[in-house]
Regions:
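Helix-breaking motifs and short loop linkers at transmembrane-helix boundaries and internal kinks
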Residues: 37-39, 71, 92-98, 109, ...
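Juxtamembrane intracellular "pre-TM" segments in multi-pass secondary transporters
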Residues: 1-2, 186-217
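Cytoplasmic helix-loop-helix junction between adjacent transmembrane helices
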Residues: 102-143
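Helix-loop-helix hairpin linking two adjacent transmembrane segments in secondary transporters
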Residues: 98, 136-181
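Helix-to-loop junctions at the C-terminal end of transmembrane segments
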Residues: 60-71, 263-276
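Paired small-residue
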Residues: 82, 86-89, 97-105, 306-312
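A late C-terminal transmembrane helix in Major Facilitator Superfamily
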Residues: 328-366, 375
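Conserved MFS/SLC helix-loop-helix module at the cytosolic interface between two early adjacent transmembrane helices
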Residues: 58-97
Length: 400
């Protein structure tokens, strides 16, 4: 697990996986400015984020099985090319309707570089090794939440919000170059020959009948829904409610993202020592407890920026252990249909995230309360689901 090829693969897959998140995170500091420039309200601007998540989810149900049938690289070419076209459209959008439409197109392409790398991880490794590679991949692509908002705020200051989408377009082109010159095909021709549309439908049916897969996917979905709530609301809360500048907001966002990333890097080592189920159980308990504490403080009138950042730092650290471990556990039993499994998992998680963003938009009131309450609710749901899912399957013992 320490050879150069392992690290090189993590770097390439991480950079590809970062393409979609960059399209989300880089424009977060610009959300209030976009609303002003396009003469629209907060909820309408949030719909541009929801549109991306919806199409991002839909596309995964296509790219995952396609990567089983045609190999891992062709869907990457098609998806990233579509992503670049959508990004250019966003840069040229004359109003909020066109921005939402091109964000939808951007998301349709952006699904490929997020779902295919997960399938490649399963092609190459299982268990603790897969967890280690998934965590390293997350380290690379999760640099996006740290750097992208800061880069976005600098671009806004220098050239305005539209320039953000020109930069994102260039990132997509770089992704095409990476696929062409640095990525090897990991889906053998013999396995591709065994895959077709009918087998994909059978694979989906098999996965939907697997309560362990569905349970783990749901845990990850509600865990990520907490982060989606933060993505959709944090710029308005921190900039408009707490009075931060876009650059200050990007730094505050980076602090919490760094916690998520940093802790995730211990997932592989902890899995080797304690086993995946125990890691998920403890991490979800800590995540839910910290988010409930945050909501309680806020509703008790302790509405300070420092307490919020501090508690989110702790909570997102726990979440950093949940995401890679639940992904690996969900895919471990389905290596022969890893593309379909990865696609279905990603689709279900993102659809839930989009629905949560839409619902949360109704409760926006200019304060932090809807955001912290929403995060606490989905965190508790994730913890409850873990009690059912992990309790319905024989406990995995830690390696000796």
């Amino acid at each position: 697990m320490t050879n150069p090829k392992f690290f090189r693969m993590a770097l390439v897959l991480g950079l590809l996986s970062a393409i979609g998140p960059f399209a989300i995170d880089m424009y977060l500091p610009a959300l209030p400015a976009i609303g002003v420039a396009l003469h629209t309200d907060t909820h309408a601007v949030q719909m541009s984020l929801m549109a991306f998540f919806v199409s991002f989810a839909i596309s995964q149900i296509v790219y995952g099985p396609a990567s089983d049938i045609f190999g891992r690289k062709p869907p990457l070419y098609a998806g990233i090319a579509l992503f670049v076209i959508g990004s250019i459209g966003c840069a040229l959008a004359p109003d909020i309707v066109w921005l939402i439409a091109f964000r939808f197109l951007q998301g349709l392409g952006g699904g490929a570089p997020i779902v295919v790398p997960r399938a490649i991880v399963r092609d190459l490794h299982t268990g603790a090794e897969a967890t280690q590679l998934m965590a390293m991949l997350m380290l690379v692509f999760s640099v996006s939440p740290i750097l992208a908002p800061l880069i976005g705020s600098l671009i806004i200051d220098a050239a305005g919000w539209r320039a953000i989408f020109w930069v994102v377009s260039a990132i997509g082109v770089i992704g095409l170059v990476l696929v062409a010159f640095t990525l090897e095909e990991t889906r053998p021709a013999a396995q591709r020959a065994q895959s077709d549309v009918a087998s994909t439908l059978r694979a989906f049916a098999l996965l939907l009948r697997d309560p362990h897969f569905i349970g783990l996917t749901a845990i990850g979905a509600f865990g990520m829904a907490a982060f989606f709530i933060y993505l959709a609301n944090s710029s308005f809360v921190l900039i408009e409610h707490y009075g931060l500048t876009p650059r200050q907001y990007s730094l505050a966002f980076a602090v919490n993202a760094a916690s998520f990333i940093g802790v995730s890097q211990f997932a592989g080592k902890l899995a080797e020592r304690y086993g995946l189920p125990r890691i998920v159980s403890v991490a979800l308990l800590g995540f839910a407890a910290s988010m409930v504490v945050l909501a309680t403080l806020n509703f008790a009138g302790i509405d300070g920026l420092a307490p919020m950042i501090a508690v989110l730092l702790i909570g997102f650290g726990f979440l950093g252990l949940v995401v890679p471990t639940t992904s690996v556990m969900a895919l471990d039993d389905h290596g022969e249909i890893a593309g379909a499994a990865s696609a279905l998992m990603g689709t279900l998680q993102l659809v839930l995230g989009a629905l949560v963003i839409a619902v949360m938009g109704v409760f926006v009131d200019g304060t932090a309360r809807p955001m912290v309450a929403g995060i606490a609710v989905v965190a508790v749901i994730a913890w409850v689901l873990s009690r059912w899912t992990l309790g319905s399957r024989p406990r995995e013992t830690a390696p000796a």
